Amino acid sequence: MKPLFVFECDLVEGRQVRCMDINQANPDLVVVGYGEFDINCTDDSKLKPGLLCFWTLKNPNFPEKIINHEASITCCQFSKKAPHLVAVGDSSGNIAIYNIRGNDTKPVAESKDLDFKHTDIVWDIQWVQRENKGESLISISGDGKIIEWSLRKGLEYTELMQLKRETNPNQKDVYAGAEIEKKSGGMTFINTGGLSIDFPQNSEQNITYFAATEDCTIHMCSMSYSEQYLETYSGHTGPIYRVRCNPFWHKDDCPIFLTCSYDWTVRVWSAKEPNPKLTCHQIETLKQQVNDIYWSPNTSSVFASVANDGRIEIWDLKKDNLAPVKTYFDKDSDGKEINTAKTVVRFSRNSPVLLAGSENGKVGVYRTLGLEHVQVSERD
């Protein structure tokens, strides 16, 4: 990997990079969401508001557009059907839609004034094309709710699922925010928080999806059933920060998906097997939570991960599932490793470039060397 340049400006000082997405219609356009987070702060009004910056790979010196947002931004994604729209989720539980055409920086729709909305942090969002419904937005939150938002008339909601805690034999006293009902015989855990959501890209109707939770499990769910899971996957021993489906692999309608966790591991799963197929980590050196993962858009066996000690790793499952093919740390002027936590990672869609955001507000842009492009057979 070779560092090219860094997206940074004075406006993002004191904020962390929390999310990032690349526009499908214009692959040089990158949206980055920023926020200030302090686990010891009980009053969000004392924290800096969120910031949405639109950078381009052709002009890294300053954002093309800047949008101020009331609360810290936790997730963002461009619409696939209307790439001038970008959806945002934040630390207050609000969903907002922005139109980046023109000079207006106010949201065209948002959920904060609705009677029904998320009551906790929105951790992940996904635009999904629904049969006979057009494109809708799906959100998952720490309140345990998964909600579908329609933009036909402002924002209209449909609750898809209230996540319930499942018994996890791998869990070791990690209950992370689950709602508890006290009973005479002890404690019964009812709801659990959701942290990430993704849809297999081969699904014709986009009915099936995967939800990662605070209680260390992943659930395969259907948009047609709100009362039960289709399958539950156990293997992690800490909250699962991200779940991402492989964009190529859909043999026998059996998605392959990745997860990363507080437990220092990245795991590879087959939808037909409730236990992980592979566990990817460096046994001797990786003792840090893995904050994000992202599949390569060009090669079906390649993905990137970033961890809390500042490392960027590139993996190729065809070559090795126990060690990455490349581990990279930023370095200071003296050549020493910089251990600022990396929070987000993305591959560029149209060039051999990787982007990684950090908790110091910087987004590093790197050239990836030696990665092969996908063969036609890998898409089948």
Predicted stretch roles:
Residues M1-G50, F54, K106-A109, E135-S136, ...:
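Acidic and/or Ser/Thr-rich intrinsically disordered tails and linkers
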Residues D115-V122, Y233-R242, K277-Y294, N321-R349, ...:
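Conserved blade-ending motifs and adjacent loop-strand segments that build the rim/top face
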Residues G50-N61, I66, A71-M187, Y294-S296, ...:
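Conserved, structured regulatory domains from eukaryotic proteins
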Residues N23-A25, S79-K81, V128-R130, P200-N202, ...:
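Structural WD40 beta-propeller signal
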